[in-house]
Amino acid sequence: MLQDYLTLRQAYLTRPDTRTQIHQNYVRNLFLYETFRLGGHNLPPTIFENIVSTGKPQSTETTRQAYDLWQAWQYCEKQAALRQPLDLSFVRAVSARIMKHTGGETTTSVGRYDTSLGDFRLGEDYDEVYPLADFRKIPLLLDNLCRTTEVQLTEAGVSENIKIVATFMYDFMHIKPFGYCNLETGILLINFLELKEEHPLLILFADDRAELLNALKQGKISETPETLEAFILHEQIKFFNREI
């Protein structure tokens, strides 16, 4: 599968129009819309694209969520151009922007945190398959993950890139730093990394959400996430085949 991905990637990148602003805007909008739907939200594509093109949300909660996702990605684009390191402050800033208009203060048995400020969750969070990281360990686990990923990407070629970002996404979702929007935050972060390294955006299709969630549940934290890596490769092959 990796060789198919590399072959299609090269064919896609050699197309004359892939570097045009029109095509880049199209890919960006597709990426954001699929990410929005993966987060469990839904809007007609025309309304979503109108929010992105005008920068103006409507009065509903769903359109505000779309606007916030768009603003969070704009922030990622600007920081990628500045070569912003992947660190705790940046991760929190991305999450805060995603939750800016729909987040708020949450109270648990151990304290309060504000999702609109990018606060880390307080309190245990258990999934039906595996327990997620102890909330007291979130800063250390996430800091180590960010540092490791940054170092690995500076030394990686195209062949290793997908494995590295898949590992980041997998461990990020097992740490589950935030009370909400972890999936959207994780997807924006791996694409921030791709943008910074001048790789094509990773398009994960909402129609394959069940497969994505299943891939994220395979194994334990810090294990090599082969299932997720294969899923991301499959999604990119699917995208390239659509475009070539």
Residue positions per predicted region:
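FIC/Doc superfamily catalytic core
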Residues: 1-244
